[in-house]
């Protein structure tokens, strides 16, 4: 199961976050607590998260509520958005040139992380807390619609025969 982190002030302000280490805001912490309550019946075996504060904090709130330790993996990070980082969406509307991490490299990195998690936890229920762009890359890899994914959006999926597949 993959989930996008809960809300930050930069989400609320519609700012590009990328690798910026922006913490959750109060609403984000409340969202993470609600997510934990919703996932209580899932009997998770493990929780893995991006090392960026917004994903790590989301995972830690869920983990503390469910009694599951969080393992951090930097390969689950959001795409590096280059010079867009910290700027609002409207500020970059007329900046067509992308100077961040290539989408292909981001997809490779996130797939590598998910594959490693699946190999460490065969036949187990794992929650992976990551970012909207990371979830988008996985959807694109499968030829699915690439979002957008709101904060705390959960995507039920499984790793089978060396590949990720959606469950819903």
Predicted regions span which residues?
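General small-molecule cofactor/ligand-binding pocket signal
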Residues: 1, 71-73, 165
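A polyampholytic, Gly/Pro-enriched intrinsically disordered region
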Residues: 88-101, 165-168
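Glycine-rich phosphate-binding loop signature in dinucleotide/nucleotide-binding domains
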Residues: 41-43, 117-124
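Loop-to-helix element that buttresses phosphate recognition and phosphoryl-transfer chemistry
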Residues: 1-56, 99-111
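Phosphate-coordination/substrate-recognition cap region in phosphate-metabolizing enzymes
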Residues: 33-94
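Short amphipathic alpha-helical segments
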Residues: 14-15, 59-63, 139-142
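Generic beta-sheet signal
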Residues: 122-132
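Domain-level recognition of soluble alpha/beta enzyme cores
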Residues: 143-167
């Amino acid at each position: 199961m993959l989930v996008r982190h809960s809300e930050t002030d930069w989400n609320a302000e519609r700012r590009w976050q990328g690798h910026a280490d922006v913490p959750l805001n109060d609403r984000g912490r409340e969202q993470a607590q609600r997510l934990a309550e919703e996932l209580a019946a899932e009997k998770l075996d493990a929780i893995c998260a991006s090392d960026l504060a917004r994903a790590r904090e989301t995972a830690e709130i869920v983990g503390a509520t469910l009694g599951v330790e969080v393992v951090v993996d930097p390969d689950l990070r959001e795409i590096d958005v280059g010079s867009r980082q910290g700027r609002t969406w409207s500020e970059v509307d007329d900046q067509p040139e992308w100077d961040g991490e290539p989408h292909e490299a981001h997809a490779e990195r996130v797939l590598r992380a998910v594959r490693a998690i699946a190999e460490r936890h065969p036949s187990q229920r794992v929650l992976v807390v990551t970012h909207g762009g990371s979830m988008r890359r996985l959807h694109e890899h499968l030829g699915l619609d690439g979002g957008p994914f709101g904060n705390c959006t959960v995507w039920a999926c499984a790793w089978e025969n060396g590949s990720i597949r959606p469950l819903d």
